[in-house]
A protein has these predicted regions:
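Active-site-adjacent structural elements that line small-molecule/cofactor binding pockets in enzymes
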Residues: 1-343
Length: 343
């Protein structure tokens, strides 16, 4: 099991980078860099590649709609070269509020687009001349442009032709696609004991089509982490606020994928209540309405013995990357302890 964390997109990027340098020394294996409608993730990942030596750097995630497939592939190849083979491309659909509201492009056919983007990226990394006919047409047909486009291949030799692709997937079809085509899966808001119950059929269907060369599917899981008693209250508040944001406000009513995943884990009534409160502007009440047992099982907050039990539950669910959001006076020291527990 590897140890990973995610940088918050609203934080100062320079301070984020300094924290990663310290966490790398403490044993962190992988850092994910988010991109919502904040600073772009690519700039910080390039900076991290220069500041770090060992830690893997993942895009967590690059929205599939905001870049062309070939630009996504070029960006991944460039970051992988700068980091000397430490980059992982995380892809995700984001949601219509961000894609249409901030980027101004239609949010349509996310699963089909993800499949084509994965295919195009891998073709670019193999330095093939890109010819693709689907939702994306490359080169552009003459009737849609000047008629001067021709198939091209990447100029540079990539550091790797098999840059790992991870997908943030919550819907059944997208999870199935991920299990079929991606090296890794980035689920969210999951109680580990519920992972198979919610996503088992989709994972099995995708795995049945999976190429042997991809190896077993890697999966992240974990949550807010605290083991010191004086940190329990702020850690639980951080977790509740984050859960309320995603379950209640990260998407319009009826199009909130996080709300759906929460409901499918046995919390249908609570999902509706949290969303109603959050969308009504009662964010603190939404956070308080989250069931205690969900907060306990979807985080790593408690005495060392309890946290080690939760890590064991993550491992039993098939989690390969323990994903932590640490709350501590001395974060590197906390990560060093957890590093020992998972080895």
């Amino acid at each position: 099991m590897l140890l990973s964390t995610q940088l918050q997109y609203g934080d100062d990027p320079i301070r984020n980078a300094e924290s990663v340098v310290a966490m790398e020394r403490a044993g962190l294996d992988m850092v994910w860099v988010a991109e919502a409608y904040s600073f772009d993730a690519v700039s910080l990942m390039g900076y991290l590649a220069a500041r770090t030596e060992r830690v893997q750097i993942g895009a967590g995630i690059l929205p599939i709609y905001s870049r062309t497939p070939t630009l996504t592939a070029m960006t991944a190849a460039g970051l992988d070269a700068l980091s000397q083979g430490r980059f992982a491309l995380g892809l995700g659909a984001s949601g219509p509020q961000v894609i249409e509201g901030f980027h101004g492009v239609p949010y349509d056919r996310p699963v089909a687009r993800t499949r084509e983007i994965i295919e195009i990226c891998r073709s670019v990394w193999r330095r093939e001349k890109i010819e693709h006919d689907g939702l994306y047409t490359i080169p552009l047909p003459p009737e849609r442009g000047t008629g001067l486009g021709k198939p091209l291949k990447l100029i540079n030799q990539p550091h790797r032709a098999d840059i790992p692709i991870w997908v943030a997937a919550l819907g059944e079809k997208n999870v199935q696609l991920t299990a079929e085509l991606a090296q890794g899966w980035l689920p969210h808001l999951m109680v580990p004991e519920q992972l198979r119950a919610v996503f088992g059929p989709a994972l099995d269907a995708g795995t049945a089509k999976r190429a042997a060369g991809l190896g077993p599917l890697q999966i992240t899981g974990g949550g807010v982490l605290a083991v010191d008693e004086d940190m329990f209250a702020p850690a639980r508040k951080r977790a509740r606020d984050m859960f309320a944001l995603y379950i209640g406000g990260m998407g319009a009513r009826g199009r909130n994928f996080y709300n759906t995943v929460f409901a499918r884990q046995g919390y249908a009534a609570e999902a509706e209540l949290v969303q109603d409160l959050y969308l009504d502007g009662r964010k603190d009440e939404a956070a308080a309405a989250l069931p205690d047992d969900f907060v306990d099982r979807a985080t790593l907050i408690g005495p060392p013995g309890f946290v080690r039990e939760r890590i064991a539950a993550q491992r039993a669910a098939g989690i390969t990357h323990l994903h932590v959001n640490p709350v501590a006076e001395d974060v590197p020291r906390l990560l060093s302890r957890v590093r020992e527990w998972i080895e």
